[in-house]
Design a protein with these regions (language model features):
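Conserved N-terminal structural module of periplasmic/extracytoplasmic solute-binding proteins
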Residues: 1-83, 87, 99-102, 150, ...
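Loop/turn elements at helix/coil->beta-strand transitions in domains of secreted/extracellular proteins
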Residues: 19-22, 42-46, 68-72, 119-120, ...
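Beta->alpha turn/N-cap motifs
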Residues: 27-29, 76-80, 179-181, 275-285
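Extracytoplasmic/periplasmic substrate-binding proteins
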Residues: 32, 205-320, 326
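Hinge/lid segment of periplasmic solute-binding proteins
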Residues: 76-133, 140, 162, 293-300, ...
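Helix-loop-helix "hinge/cap" segment bordering the ligand-binding cleft or interdomain interface
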Residues: 96-100, 114-183, 191-227, 316-322, ...
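Bilobed periplasmic-binding protein-like "clamshell/Venus-flytrap" ligand-binding domains
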Residues: 121-122, 168-179, 334-347, 426-434
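Mature extracytoplasmic/periplasmic domains
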Residues: 282-283, 305-306, 310-393, 435
Length: 435
């Protein structure tokens, strides 16, 4: 409990009272807003530094290994956390009584914040399960319904997705901007089981689906985060070619909106049916839907997936750990803060269960009045975190490279899969591989 903490750490308690300050190192702007609010409510001066995700692990490592006592608050995305835990960078939150709050946070988020010994090291303020954001008007026209449960059936397996894509193309639409929209639904099994590489049939089914979507022109060939990808949220987009997407044809610059418009002014146009994104996609879509606002719905995909999320903890070197714990609680375990964030962010999905419960009947007008908090909570309940391993990002990237090599004709399926095995073997020699 916090009582025993005070007596064991008398020194740090006194010094933290002395300077009434916190230094936060984070990856996104969210904590800038949280920091300002914490400062307003507590009088603690919060100095928040936002660092590029690519540079973040190195910066934290350099500071903490050098014994720096600031930052006080550090964060991590899920794929960074295991290394941070192993290095001892995060203080033990159970010393502050974190387990008292176990039932207040969505299960998978609580588990992500634990190290391999089950000690709580970090907590996130948001849940990030994935779903498909689809156009209700197109669903009605092509499939006769825009009901999320019914539309979910069109995405319920890799083979039904291919069938859905064909029907949409026959009506002049494209199912996705590109096959990258499937990346959060790339499989439902662990990549590594008992030290062995595990490539199950579903991984191959996913691979085949990506290749088929690409080869049959079922997508608009618009890369995620590019100009046409954002445009597709607001309405019609030019249909690009596979060569433009792969970069083999560089006549169209998809990263510069002015050049893009000029280069594609005579191109055939289409509307894109769906985007595959985690719950934070609500915010991305909000800023880009324009005139299609109200015409969207959200439904489940073929597997339970999640992506991203900012997990907050205390630096083990911090001399202000009690104040830092107050900040962690303020961001993640506080109903007032959760209510404020739901409103302020215009729809980010918090992890604090009492707030999700309270907002479960909130209707989101951009999505035709759908009750999104209820939907995301259901999706989050389906996430089995025991299937997540520290190897996922690199093995998943290597599998994606194999898929790209097959769909662009650079390699045969057999050669691409063998190259995948080679990559895994050289990157992680400790993993046993049966070819």
């Amino acid at each position: 409990s916090s009582g025993s903490k005070d007596s064991t750490q008398g020194g740090s308690k006194t010094s933290s009272k002395g300077d009434n300050k916190l230094v936060v190192w984070t990856l996104t702007n969210d904590l800038v807003d949280y920091g300002k609010r914490f400062q307003e409510q507590t009088g603690v001066k919060v100095d928040t530094v936002v660092i590029e995700p690519a540079d973040y692990p190195t910066k934290v490592q350099t500071a903490l290994l050098a014994g720096e006592t600031e930052p006080d608050i550090i964060v991590g995305e899920p794929q960074m956390l295991d290394d941070f835990y192993d290095a001892g960078f995060f203080a033990n939150l159970d010393d502050f009584g974190a387990q008292d709050y176990k039932d207040k946070i969505v299960d998978y988020v609580w588990e992500v914040g634990q190290d391999s010994d089950g000690i709580q090291r970090a907590i996130s303020y948001q849940i990030t399960p994935a779903g498909f954001y689809y156009r209700r008007d197109i669903a009605k026209e092509v499939f006769g319904t825009d009901d999320p449960d019914e539309v979910g059936k069109l995405f319920s397996s890799y083979s039904t997705i291919l069938d859905t894509a064909k029907k949409l193309k026959d009506k002049g639409y494209r199912i996705f901007s590109s096959d990258a929209e499937l990346s959060y639904f790339s499989g439902d099994s662990a990549w590594v089981v008992d030290g062995k590489l595990n490539v199950d049939q579903a991984r191959y089914d996913y691979m085949d689906l990506c290749v088929d979507l690409y080869k049959n022109d079922y997508t608009a060939y618009a890369t995620q985060w590019s100009t046409p990808w954002y445009q597709a949220m607001a309405g019609e987009v030019p249909i690009l070619s596979a060569d433009i997407q792969s970069g083999a044809d560089d006549s169209v610059n998809v990263w510069d909106s002015t050049q893009f418009e000029e280069a594609t002014k005579d191109a055939q146009k289409t509307s894109v049916f769906a985007f595959g994104l985690p719950a934070w996609g609500v915010l991305t879509m909000r800023d880009h839907v324009g005139d299609t606002s109200g015409k969207w719905g959200v439904c489940a995909g073929p597997t339970y997936g999640f992506g991203g999320g900012t997990y907050i903890g205390i630096s083990s070197n911090s001399k202000r750990q009690d104040t830092a714990w107050d900040f962690v609680k303020f961001c993640t375990l506080n109903e007032d803060t959760s209510d404020w964030w739901i409103d302020y962010s215009q729809g980010d999905t918090v992890s604090y269960l009492p707030a999700l419960e309270k907002h479960k009947d909130d209707e989101n007008e951009i999505y035709g009045g759908e009750k999104l908090y209820q939907f995301w909570l259901e999706q989050a309940k389906g996430i089995d975190y025991s299937k997540v391993t520290r190897y996922d990002k690199q093995i998943g990237d290597a599998w994606s490279q194999a898929i790209s090599a097959i769909k662009t004709g650079e390699k045969s399926k057999e050669d691409a899969v063998n190259a995948f095995y080679d990559t895994v073997q050289s990157t992680f020699p400790e993993i046993e591989i049966d070819r």
